[in-house]
């Protein structure tokens, strides 16, 4: 996962998990002051700063407060047995439209939970597992060696860039990670450059519209908010598959 403006160990002191259920907290306060984007930001990227909510960093993008993040000590949470029941990742992976030789980037790959499950679907392709935490990448390398998988490639990204060559990707996947990016505008711009024309973004986020999804508000997104942010970055909304238990499965095209 990507580390934002202030790193957070995603442990029980910051997010209480009981039988796979995450304790909810209050919604964020609105932003109160505009700030200039960094020099590397596209001209259209504007952030605001305000009071940070308990789970946020006090930085806002298109009115959404960016959440605190999951750190590498939470690998156990990413690899939990309940994930198949709660999120149906097998169903999500089967819904990816990937050619056998596709190159897909798993942005905020974390422990590689998705990357290693996508790997056999693209035997002549590659999964580029992008993360900015060296500890996550070390875990990925060790797991790849244990599994004998050679087409999952750990890749060190940056907080404001996927750090991949232009037009090098057929697709990109972001699973419960985008809402944590500390520089989402710059990340989307770099991803737009890295995707080939017609390349797809598969964006999975817990449904912010559904109060029954037991995830804290800042770690969820509505479809409307996701569309606002990605369409402003030049991506075309294609569809939102609705068969997953807790998550949106949104598809965008470059």
Ranges and model annotations:
Residues 111-123:
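Conserved SAM-binding loop of SAM-dependent methyltransferases across substrates and taxa
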Residues 170-184:
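A short SAM/SAH-binding and catalytic strip from SAM-dependent methyltransferases
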Residues 202-225:
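Conserved class I S-adenosyl-L-methionine
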Residues 185-200:
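A short glycine-rich, Lys/Arg-flanked "PGG" loop and its adjoining helix->strand segment in the class I
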Residues 162-171:
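A short acidic, Gly/Pro-enriched loop at the edge of an enzyme's catalytic core
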């Amino acid at each position: 996962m990507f580390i934002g403006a202030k790193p957070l160990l995603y442990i029980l002191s910051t997010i209480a998990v009981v039988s796979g259920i995450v304790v909810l907290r209050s919604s964020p306060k609105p932003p109160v002051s505009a700030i200039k984007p960094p020099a590397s930001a596209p001209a259209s990227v504007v952030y605001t700063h305000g009071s940070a909510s308990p789970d946020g960093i006090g930085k806002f993008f298109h009115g959404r407060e960016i959440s605190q993040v999951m750190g590498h000590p939470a690998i156990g949470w990413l690899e939990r047995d309940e994930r198949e029941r709660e999120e149906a990742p097998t169903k999500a992976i089967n819904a990816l439209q990937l050619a056998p030789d596709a190159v897909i980037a798993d942005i905020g790959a974390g422990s590689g939970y998705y990357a290693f499950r996508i790997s056999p679907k693209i035997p002549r392709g590659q999964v580029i597992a992008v993360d900015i935490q060296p500890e996550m990448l070390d875990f990925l390398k060790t797991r790849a060696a244990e599994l004998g998988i050679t087409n999952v490639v750990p890749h060190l990204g940056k907080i404001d860039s996927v750090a991949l060559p232009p037009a090098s990707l057929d697709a990109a996947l972001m699973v419960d990670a985008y809402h944590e990016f500390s520089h989402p505008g710059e990340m989307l711009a770099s991803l737009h450059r890295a995707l080939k024309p017609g390349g797809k973004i598969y964006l999975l986020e817990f449904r912010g519209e559904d109060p029954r999804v037991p995830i804290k508000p800042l770690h969820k997104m509505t479809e409307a908010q996701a569309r606002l942010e990605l369409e402003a970055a030049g991506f075309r909304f294609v569809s939102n598959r609705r068969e997953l238990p807790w998550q949106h499965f949104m598809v965008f095209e470059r």
